[in-house]
Swiss-Prot record:
<dbReference type="Pfam" id="PF01139">
    <property type="entry name" value="RtcB"/>
</dbReference>
<dbReference type="InterPro" id="IPR027513">
    <property type="entry name" value="RtcB_euk"/>
</dbReference>
<dbReference type="InterPro" id="IPR036025">
    <property type="entry name" value="RtcB-like_sf"/>
</dbReference>
<feature type="binding site">
    <location>
        <position position="122"/>
    </location>
    <ligand>
        <name>Mn(2+) 2</name>
    </ligand>
</feature>
<dbReference type="GO" id="GO:0005737">
    <property type="term" value="C:cytoplasm"/>
</dbReference>
<feature type="binding site">
    <location>
        <position position="119"/>
    </location>
    <ligand>
        <name>Mn(2+) 1</name>
    </ligand>
</feature>
<dbReference type="GO" id="GO:0007281">
    <property type="term" value="P:germ cell development"/>
</dbReference>
<dbReference type="GO" id="GO:0005525">
    <property type="term" value="F:GTP binding"/>
</dbReference>
<keyword id="KW-0436">Ligase</keyword>
<protein>
    <recommendedName>
        <fullName>RNA-splicing ligase RtcB homolog</fullName>
        <ecNumber>6.5.1.8</ecNumber>
    </recommendedName>
</protein>
<feature type="binding site">
    <location>
        <begin position="226"/>
        <end position="230"/>
    </location>
    <ligand>
        <name>GMP</name>
    </ligand>
</feature>
<comment type="similarity">
    <text>Belongs to the RtcB family.</text>
</comment>
<feature type="binding site">
    <location>
        <position position="259"/>
    </location>
    <ligand>
        <name>Mn(2+) 2</name>
    </ligand>
</feature>
<comment type="function">
    <text>Catalytic subunit of the tRNA-splicing ligase complex that acts by directly joining spliced tRNA halves to mature-sized tRNAs by incorporating the precursor-derived splice junction phosphate into the mature tRNA as a canonical 3',5'-phosphodiester. May act as an RNA ligase with broad substrate specificity, and may function toward other RNAs.</text>
</comment>
<feature type="binding site">
    <location>
        <begin position="402"/>
        <end position="405"/>
    </location>
    <ligand>
        <name>GMP</name>
    </ligand>
</feature>
<feature type="binding site">
    <location>
        <position position="227"/>
    </location>
    <ligand>
        <name>Mn(2+) 1</name>
    </ligand>
</feature>
<dbReference type="GO" id="GO:0036498">
    <property type="term" value="P:IRE1-mediated unfolded protein response"/>
</dbReference>
């Protein structure tokens, strides 16, 4: 007999103003507790989703995010807690915005493609300029068009980077070292990139021919969905020192944000691995609450193959963002009739939102190697962490939070408390509140475009019909999400940006 909504809620208790705990027993076989971060506005959405699920009694595609946090807590060798961030919403296997870490030294520890997501290393890059809003306003339409012309966008968009099959293998294994060699990146771009733009364990041989076939023509393309390129201006500075380390020194300063991932290649790597892992689960007798949580032991051949293929897809995404940076620099140079160098178009940082990595964390005061799954969440290392660039040693790692189309974005920095509480992880964006299908039914695309224009935002869209899926009404309020993380102490607000021009797939 399924439990009622009130019975479900008896397993969930508030710890602080912004943190809830999910007690063991909420779903079967939980090895650790669950925990999620929400403020009052976001809490309503979380519990509403659970209430609807109790009413429907499991009819429909996705489980509510709270239950997904519980199911992840039942995975073998999970450490501390299964954690949900304020932008959490239901996804495949893991909710998007769910983090989990597994002890690599435990022979039962697993890696799960559902804990990374289909768009491997979907992420965000922020580039600064020395321009001010007043420099851009007179040529804003021209600039939006120039970016749209330079960056291939849309569902079936083909790349403009000439590349053969042999070079493609190199690009999968070398990541940004490849774009540096080919002249698409500046040497210092790599310094300001998570993993320095290259995961060393990548092995192109672990990426199927079908995945390569899908990825090859898409190099340097934006794709559709929630991916975008935005020209933004600095709207507020909360932490002047951190902002100055990032090269942000005034309100109205112009930046470019690029949000994209590994396109069809990453999707295929995930799909291929799920098939293989189902077999490995039968062989190793791994039992999970939800078959979407297909996984393999980290130290098994299947687990290692997935991590190597995932790393190659992650490298592809960094190459992708680097090629788009190259295109954006060209677009700006053309409109302002000067060089990208003279426009000071340096990368502030580049972060990944969907990835699994082996990292060292303190568990009960002892350093442990953990496989941290971050799906729809961002690494946020604290000040003095050895893996962040020299420029940010005193501020903590920059964390880039993209808003939704036409809403503000944020730059945060990592904190020591986040290191201790959430495996140095914080939110990644607004998080969906309406499914894509609901958005298409309820929102008119022309209305969305008109609203953007009324806000003074120039927009270029390859597939206007997809715009309503990404309308601000489809998402949670990004300010609520960021403020919840700030209040919880797992990241700290530095800068707020607002868009003045958007290009979308």
């Amino acid at each position: 007999m399924p439990r009622t909504y009130d019975e479900e809620c008896s397993y969930i208790e508030r710890i602080t103003d912004v943190v809830y705990r999910i007690k063991k027993g909420f779903v079967p076989n939980m090895n650790v507790e669950g925990r999620f971060y929400v403020n009052t506005a976001l809490e309503k959405l979380m519990f509403e989703e659970l209430r609807n699920a109790c009413r429907l009694d499991g009819i429909g595609g996705f489980l509510p995010a709270v239950r997904q946090i519980g199911n992840v807590a039942a995975l073998p060798a999970i450490v501390n807690a299964s954690i949900g961030l304020p932008d959490i919403h239901s996804g495949y296997g893991f909710a998007i915005g769910n983090i989990a870490a597994f002890d690599v030294s435990d022979p039962d520890a697993v890696v799960s493609p559902g804990g990374v997501g289909f768009d491997i290393n979907c992420g965000v890059r922020l580039i600064r300029t020395n321009l001010s809003e007043k420099d851009v306003q007179p040529v804003k339409e021209q600039l939006a068009q120039s970016l749209f012309d330079h960056i291939p966008v849309g569902v079936g968009s083909k790349g403009i980077i000439p590349i053969g099959a042999q070079q493609f293998e190199e690009c999968l294994e070398m990541g940004m070292d490849w774009t540096l060699r080919e002249g698409y990146s500046w040497a210092e771009d790599k310094e300001h990139c998570e993993e320095y733009g290259r995961m060393l364990q990548a092995d192109a041989a672990k990426v199927s021919p079908r995945a390569k076939k899908r990825g090859l023509p898409q190099l340097g393309t934006l794709g559709a969905g929630n991916h975008y390129g935005e020209v933004q201006v600095i709207d507020e500075i909360y932490d002047e020192y951190a902002a100055s380390r990032m090269g942000i020194d005034r309100l109205g300063q112009v930046c470019i944000m690029i949000h994209c991932g590994s396109r069809g290649l990453g999707h295929q790597v995930a799909t291929d691995s799920l098939v293989v892992m189902e077999k490995a689960m039968k062989r190793d007798n791994i039992i999970v609450n939800d078959r979407q949580l297909a996984c393999a032991r980290i130290n098994s051949m299947e687990g290692q193959d997935y991590l190597k293929g995932m790393a190659a897809a992650a490298n592809f995404a960094w190459v992708n963002r680097s090629c788009m940076t190259f295109c954006a620099r060209q677009a700006f140079a053309k409109v302002f009739n000067t060089s990208p160098d003279d426009l000071d178009m340096h990368v502030i940082y580049d972060v990944s939102h969907n990835i699994a990595k082996i990292e060292e964390h303190l568990i009960n005061g002892r350093p442990k190697q953990l496989c941290v799954h971050r799906k729809g969440s961002t690494r946020a290392f604290p000040p003095h962490h050895p893996l962040i660039p020299v420029d940010y040693q005193l501020t903590g790692q920059p964390v880039l939070i993209g808003g939704t189309m036409g809403t503000c974005s944020y730059v945060l920095t990592g904190t020591e408390q986040g290191m201790n509480e959430t495996f140095a992880t914080t939110c990644h964006g607004a998080g969906r509140a309406l499914s894509r299908a609901k958005s298409r039914r309820n929102i008119d695309f022309q209305e969305v475009l008109n609203k953007m224009q009324a806000m003074g935002i120039s927009i270029r869209v390859a597939s206007p019909k997809l715009v309503m899926e990404e309308a601000p009404e489809s998402y949670k309020n990004v300010t609520d999400v960021v403020n919840t993380c700030h209040e919880a102490g797992i990241s700290k607000k530095s800068v707020k940006l607002r868009p003045i021009a958007v290009i979308k797939g």
